[in-house]
Every structure is written in C-alpha cells, then in structure tokens.
Amino acid sequence: MVKNSFISIIFQEQEENKENRGSVEFQVVSFTNKIRKLTSHLELHKKDYLSQRGLRKILGKRQRLLAYLSKKNRARYKELIGQLNIRERKTR
C-alpha cells in the first residue's frame, strides 16, 4: 500500500501541471498506475487472459517510453525510476 500511496502523490504532483499531461514522465506514471491495478486484479483472477494481454501491451508502451527518456535525458530517467521504484531496463 505504501507504493500505491506514493504513486498517487507523484501522480497528483504531475496532475497539478495541466500543461505537462503529454510529458513522458506523466505518461510513465499513469502507465505504472494502470500496471499496478491490473497486477492486483490478476492476482485474484488468474485466468483473465484479456487483462493479461492488456497488461503486456501497457508494459511494452511503458518500456518504449522509458527507453526514449533514457536516450534523451538520462538524469530525468534515473530520477523517475527511483521515484516509481521500478527496475532499470536491461541493456544489450
């Protein structure tokens, strides 16, 4: 529950800036919220295959956005993954 409340605080901070709704950080935060909600849903409903597919699609979108942010601004990327408590993407 601590993670979810922390995510909500970050989300509210991002939401205060109405101009930044299209920013990469805001999109990653909103995808992370959706991922956490779907993950808790799938713990109860293991055979909900449509939700599993939706989760994989959202994970891919977030991964692509994080890769973009990593290339464009490494400092903002590091700060964001630190705030959201998510792992850094693997490099080849």
From Swiss-Prot:
The keyword Hydrolase does not apply. GO terms for biological process: translation. The keyword tRNA processing does not apply. Keywords: Chloroplast, Plastid, Ribonucleoprotein, Ribosomal protein. Coiled coil: none annotated. Disulfide bonds: none annotated. Its main location: plastid. SMART domains: Ribosomal_S15 (SM01387). It comes from the Eukaryota. One of its GO terms (cellular component) is ribonucleoprotein complex. It is found in: Plastid, Chloroplast. Pfam families: Ribosomal_S15. Part of the 30S ribosomal subunit. Belongs to the universal ribosomal protein uS15 family. This is Small ribosomal subunit protein uS15c.
